[in-house]
From Swiss-Prot:
Residues that hold ATP according to the record: G332, P333, N334, T335, G336, G337, K338, T339
Gene Ontology molecular function: ATP binding; ATP hydrolysis activity; ATP-dependent DNA damage sensor activity; double-stranded DNA binding; endonuclease activity; mismatched DNA binding; ribosomal large subunit binding; rRNA binding
Protein name: Endonuclease MutS2
Gene designation per UniProt: mutS2
Family the entry assigns: Belongs to the DNA mismatch repair MutS family. MutS2 subfamily.
Role noted for this protein: Endonuclease that is involved in the suppression of homologous recombination and thus may have a key role in the control of bacterial genetic diversity. Acts as a ribosome collision sensor, splitting the ribosome into its 2 subunits. Detects stalled/collided 70S ribosomes which it binds and splits by an ATP-hydrolysis driven conformational change. Acts upstream of the ribosome quality control system (RQC), a ribosome-associated complex that mediates the extraction of incompletely synthesized nascent chains from stalled ribosomes and their subsequent degradation. Probably generates substrates for RQC.
Biological processes, Gene Ontology terms: mismatch repair; negative regulation of DNA recombination; rescue of stalled ribosome
Enzyme nomenclature, EC number: 3.1.-.-, 3.6.4.-
Domain Smr residue range list: 703-778
Domain of life: Bacteria
Entries under InterPro entries matching the protein: DNA_mismatch_repair_MutS_C (IPR000432), DNA_mismatch_repair_MutS_core (IPR007696), DNA_mismatch_repair_MutS_sf (IPR036187), MSSS (IPR046893), MutS (IPR045076), MutS2 (IPR005747), P-loop_NTPase (IPR027417), Smr_dom (IPR002625)
Organism from which the protein derives: Fusobacterium nucleatum subsp. nucleatum (strain ATCC 25586 / DSM 15643 / BCRC 10681 / CIP 101130 / JCM 8532 / KCTC 2640 / LMG 13131 / VPI 4355)
Organism lineage: Bacteria, Fusobacteriati, Fusobacteriota, Fusobacteriia, Fusobacteriales
Length: 778
């Protein structure tokens, strides 16, 4: 990098925009000396951190930089024992410690901004220093009265003494003989002594010491003799106060020295946060983004804007160097924006390599160039003197001596300022040299010979700045792939110059130049046609995308409606099945009560089968709406199961896999039910417990059903009573607990219909009370 390139690309002017946001004076020098990074890893780390800070500023309130100071320079002042900081300096240290601590806490709470959290995560906690300073200094940056016991006593004495002095003056003011002596009845101070303004002509009336006179000489400031001793005492107290404050400041200085290393770490973080904040404010205000910077030798800018042109008026530039070609040659007349395009490329590259976001799309890519070299002349001058051409040659010579494959070269109006033929030849020779070195270059020229040369050479792409011949003004659009036209005669014709002059001028143009201009015109026409095709294609793509979006939305609506229908169908089916289960349960209960009436039993069996068939039909209707999931069979013939539709236990008689149903028997009832109405029941071993210290006798036994569901409890009770009857028990205890009473009600309902039960009663005293039912067996 060289200073000349920085100057012509106005990098220092860009830094001034960032300096406007700097708070700490020391950092102004840091920004002024800012230049491209030497290490790619360090640069990318900086860009990531700046990106985090930009997002923090945009979405989470940013960072409060007001009050930040270079506290490291303050620490230098107290290196030696016996030195201390003034009150305001201590307050500045306190503000910085608190700012960083609160900022770290905020980042931890947000839980994002990884780069920022890693940067600030290792700072030490110096809350103890904050507390000491806060207890010593108030927000008005004054030492508090209670900073020490001695200081409190001194200030209390001063307050009392001050009241006495005021009282003495008031007595003087009230003296009738002195009513005309005072210029004003006020107390003021001169040389640290309390005095009052007295008219010059009456000064002899008041005995005291004259300390000062007004500029007119009409007023003298006198310390009355009655106040002198009090003033002397006040001076003594003030001296003691200053000494006590000095001791307090020395103690705090010692505390700071003991924590010097930690304070210096925080000081460095504070200064870095100030720089990050300044860069980020500039970036957010100017709609800047972080480009990709890599070792690839490429310069690809998308929607790039020059930082010094109004962001709402500038025409963005898009181009790429380093992929299909190494040199971009912009041709065409002056005033078309060629130099602005060249400066945009150079300045944005310097910004990115220096860790500054650029006014361009985040899709932009910039190579980690070893050097950025620029030679930019005054493109608007009508004549260039030999001296300016010599300076131009000197700059080009220095650039060619320094460039490598990994350099970016920016040359404005190469070869201008001398004979056009020699200037064009010189320009082509320089371009050849840069092309051989594979050096990434951005070059502007208005020579026709160079246009034709660039169009035909390998590794070079021509471009031009669009010019509106109707309005006779540039549009500042960069047209890559299209060489620039001079437009001089076209402009002259539109401005009304005689046609004879225009025709004669065309005759003077050489055939070669005419061919070049014709070639450019054809290329421009084809390019415009291609642009129109691209626009049509883009419109069609957008229409197709919108159609896809509409179709997607319609599909979502249909899917939602379908789900609502399915939900409604399920709810209706569930309602009907619950009704059928209730009817089935009632039929079963009726069968058990009227078991002896065979005709009624047959009719009930028939009704139950009809209900079972209806239940299956309802299930099938629901399946038509939603594809049925095949039920997994986990039972076999002979298994004991619970049938949900009739709310009863039964045994499997037959399994019909194709129909996904099974024939079951519950008591004398036989019916076919779907698989999903069947629940396998595993037999459990009985547990035997004592109830409320009830003594077990040879003829008594218990079953504990507490904590079980009603269905499960009834099944276990039924099995238990079978065994109890076989074992000859005449009385058993069924423990169900008190609870909500639901389990007890279910068990009593079962006992009422059970064929083994003769009678039952609630447990008595010592038998469990309401928590136990005593059952007498037949």
């Amino acid at each position: 990098m060289n200073k000349h390139s920085f100057n012509v690309l106005e990098f220092d002017k860009l830094k001034e925009l960032i300096l406007a946001n700097i708070v700490i004076d020391h950092n102004r020098e840091v920004i002024e000396n800012l230049e491209p990074y030497k290490d790619l890893s360090a640069l990318n780390n900086e860009l990531k951190t700046v990106k985090d800070f930009m997002d923090l500023l945009s979405f989470d309130g940013g960072f409060e930089a007001i009050g930040l100071r270079n506290i490291n320079s303050l620490m230098e002042k107290i290196k030696l024992i016996g030195t201390y900081l003034e009150v305001e300096e201590l307050w500045n240290i306190n503000v910085n410690l608190r700012t960083v601590r609160i900022f770290k806490s905020r980042l931890d709470e947000l839980g994002k901004y990884k780069q920022l959290r890693e940067m600030i995560g290792n700072i030490p906690n110096l809350r103890v220093i904050e507390d000491v300073i806060n207890k010593t200094i108030n927000p008005e940056k004054e030492i508090k009265d209670d900073a020490s016991l001695d200081l409190r006593d001194i200030r209390l004495h001063k307050k009392t003494l001050n009241m006495n002095i005021k009282r003495k003056f008031e007595e003087l003011f009230e003296e009738p003989s002195l009513s005309n002596a005072f210029q004003e009845k006020i107390i003021t101070e001169r040389d640290g002594r309390m005095v009052t303004p007295v008219k010059y002509d009456f000064k002899g009336l008041i005995k005291g010491i004259e300390h000062d006179r007004s500029s007119s000489g009409q007023t003298v400031f006198i310390e009355p003799l009655s106040i002198v001793s009090l003033n002397n005492k006040m001076r003594e107290l003030e001296t003691k106060e200053k000494e006590e404050i000095r001791k307090i400041l020395l103690r705090i200085a010692e505390l700071l020295r003991n924590n010097k290393d930690d304070i210096l770490i925080i000081g460095e973080k504070v200064m870095y946060l100030d720089i990050l904040n300044a860069k980020s404010i500039y970036a957010v205000e100017n709609r800047c983004e972080i480009p990709t910077v890599s070792n690839k030798e490429i310069l690809s800018l998308e929607k790039a804007r020059h930082p010094f042109i109004d962001k709402d008026k500038v025409t963005p530039l898009t181009f790429e160097i380093g992929k299909d070609y190494d040199i971009l040659l912009i041709t065409g007349p002056n005033t078309g924006g060629k130099t602005v395009a060249l400066k945009t490329a150079g300045l944005l590259t310097l910004m990115a390599l220096s860790g500054i976001p650029i006014p361009a799309s985040e899709n932009s890519k910039i190579g980690f160039f070893e050097g950025v070299f620029a030679d930019i002349g005054d493109e608007q001058s009508i004549e260039q003197s030999l001296s300016s051409f010599s300076a131009h040659l000197k700059n080009v010579k220095e650039i060619l001596e320094a460039v490598t494959k990994n350099s970016l070269v920016l040359l404005d109006e190469l070869g201008s300022g001398t004979d056009p033929i020699e200037g064009a030849a010189f320009a082509m020779a320089v371009i050849d040299y840069l092309n051989e070195k594979k050096c990434k270059s951005f070059i502007t020229t208005h020579y026709s010979q160079v246009k034709a040369y660039g169009y035909n050479e390998e590794g070079i792409e021509t471009a031009s700045m669009e010019f509106n011949t109707d309005t006779l003004s540039p549009t500042y659009r960069l047209l890559v792939g299209i060489p620039g036209e001079s437009n001089a005669l076209t402009i002259a014709q539109r401005m009304g110059l005689p046609e004879s002059i225009i025709s004669k001028a065309r005759e003077y143009i050489s055939e070669d130049n005419k061919k070049v201009e014709k070639m450019i015109e054809n290329i421009k026409t084809k390019s415009q046609e291609l642009d129109e095709m691209r626009e049509r294609f883009a419109r069609l793509q957008e229409e197709a995308r919108l159609d896809r979006e509409r179709a997607k939305q319609e599909t979502l609506i249909i899917e939602k409606q379908k789900n609502e229908i399915i939900k409604s169908a399920y709810e209706e089916a569930e309602k009907m099945m619950n009704e059928m289960r209730a009817k089935a349960s009632a039929l079963v209960e009726k069968i058990q009560h009227e078991e002896k009436n065979k005709e009624d039993a047959k009719q009930i069996q028939k009704n139950l089968n009809m209900l079972s068939t209806a239940l299956r039909e309802e299930k099938n209707k629901t399946v038509e709406v939603v594809k049925k999931i095949k039920t997994k069979v986990n039972f076999k013939v002979g298994d004991r199961v619970f049938v949900k539709s009739i709310n009863q236990f039964a045994n499997i008689l037959k399994i019909n896999t194709s129909k996904e149903s099974a024939m079951v028997q519950s008591g004398i009832l036989k019916l076919e039910v779907p698989f999903d109405e069947i629940k396998i029941v595993e037999e459990k071993k009985e547990k035997v417990y004592n109830v409320n210290n009830h003594k077990k006798t040879p003829v008594r036994s218990e079953i504990d059903l507490r904590g079980k569901m009603v269905d499960e409890a009834v099944y276990e009770l039924e099995t238990y009573l079978d065994r109890a009857t076989l074992n000859g028990y005449t009385e058993v205890y069924v423990i169900h607990g008190k609870g909500t009473g639901a389990l007890r009600e279910g068990i009593l309902k079962y006992l009422k219909a059970c064929k083994y039960v003769k009678e039952y009663r609630i447990g008595g005293h010592g038998e469990g009370g309401l928590g136990c039912t005593v059952v007498t067996l037949k």
